[in-house]
Amino acid sequence: MAYNIADFIEHAVDLMPERTALETDGDARTYAQLEADANALAHQLRALGIAPGDTVGVYSRNTLECVEAMVAIFKARAVMVNVNFRYVESELEHIFTDSEMKVLIYERQFTQKVAKVLPKAPKLKHLIVIEDDVSRDIADALNHGHLTADAIEFTDAIANNSTERDFEERSNDDLYMLYTGGTTGHPKGVVWRQEDVYRVLGGGTDWFNGVPIDDEWKFANDGAAGGQLVRFPIPPFIHGGSQWAVFQALYGGGKAIIYPEFGAHQTWEIVERHTVNVIFITGDAMARPMIDALLEKDYDTSSVFSIASSAALFSQSVKDQYVDRFPNAMIIDAIGSSETGFGGLAAITKGADHAGGPRVKADPNTVLLREDGTVIPVGSEEVGVMARTGNIPLRYYNDPVKSDKTFKVYDGVRYSIPGDFARYESDGAITMLGRGSVSINSGGEKIYPEEVEQALKAHPDVFDAVVVGVPDERYGQRVSAVVATRDGARPSLASINEVARTEIAGYKCPRSVWFVDTIKRSPAGKPDYRWGTGITESREADETLAVSSTRV
């Protein structure tokens, strides 16, 4: 036995086979059914020549079959490649070739894109197609018949292969890979040992005291002894946080509610229908429309006792609304990245200091470093780059240059340093400021977009915002904002900044604003800064303020 995703899930199968593991409207899987389907699919992968360490792509929205595919890949000791279902052809080509993908499991609605990219991915030899809820018309079948004919039907792979669990012993050293979102460059595959990722994302370390959990049966035993927890991971499974919400549910005999699309009112209907206990979201992109939906219509949310956000900005003004609406629930804001895993969390209270980004209690292996690699002491007001030691990734897949830049050794200690800047608060907590690669250098001052975005969203008419730097003859760059407002409102930039200046210094406030209908974000809710820069370059600002000679 090993600290391995497939092993943990199998423990739950053995203790609770008749429990429902996965559920959506009109369909479900018990643990026994999940086990049988995943075993059969894993045998199909082996029949296609997949060996331990080979890469298998999953190109799907959140579906029951997507979860079965992930579990099957781990059972076969292969390495899963998470494929963003919103990628255009050039992005798909990059991830197919960069990952050296040998098999792709995809939803039929993506056939046209797969057909166009397949000739450019020489190592991708086999396809397994999942039927989806998008109609399959005759024209599409004729147009892409050469591809669909070569693809194995997902249902056939399950029906025509052994459902026995007769795989070789797995290892702590089996690999888990997570491709980054690519919001600041090409997506990169972050390669982890399974034991390491278990320690930081799979519950293998107590997040409050740092004590390792070494009993591999603990989650299954605890689950079998207690009631069933119902989790609803809303973000796409291309996002690591959402994957791990499902895996942890399956480790402990819980039930994961699975839906392919996000809708604010739909979310609360699902919560009500499935009596959801824990909701997983990614920041304001989901939190704002969800809380607005609750203000528009009353839903039964009495089953909810926790709402957890990760991977994207969760503004304090929005958190306050959740605390008001869910006074007895735990509202959690967690930080981390593909390169670090869990970095810290905070239980939200109303009226917390708004300055900066998320403020969390860091885990024991997270520190702040200066540029020379020395550790900033707790209590210092210096801004440093966040770094994690202990259980961290091995490397980026196929990118030794980037690996050397991110995974560094200082004074004999190996760190993962993805580039997020932060500072300590007087109580030892860490306030996140943002990714250095998108920071704005204005007159020698480094300004982090996330803390400005949070301040802008405190204005009642601002629904969403992305902050970028634009060229400025005097200061090099000036802070600018692309803003989506509520209900067609058009607040003045002066009024927006008046609210923002209650949380951030004046020199951090935007001097120009571009209004748009919606802010483009990744499926995981992260802002697309390249898109924001493109908006500022495509047309004149809707409003620009004069820059004073004295900045405060």
Regions found by a protein language model. Name each.
Residues 18-63, 67-71, 88-93:
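Conserved AMP-binding/adenylate-forming core of the ANL superfamily
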Residues 30-32, 175-203, 208-210:
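Conserved AMP-binding A3 loop
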Residues 47-48, 75-156:
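Structural core segment of the AMP-binding/adenylate-forming
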Residues 87, 93-94, 104-106, 389, ...:
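AMP-binding/adenylate-forming catalytic core of the ANL superfamily
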Residues 130, 505-526, 546-551:
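AMP-binding/adenylate-forming catalytic domain of the ANL superfamily
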Residues 152, 159-179, 186, 222-230:
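Conserved pre-ATP/AMP-binding loop-to-beta segment of ANL
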Residues 198-278, 293:
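Conserved AMP-binding/adenylation subdomain of ANL enzymes
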Residues 254, 272, 306-430, 435-439, ...:
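Conserved AMP-binding/adenylate-forming
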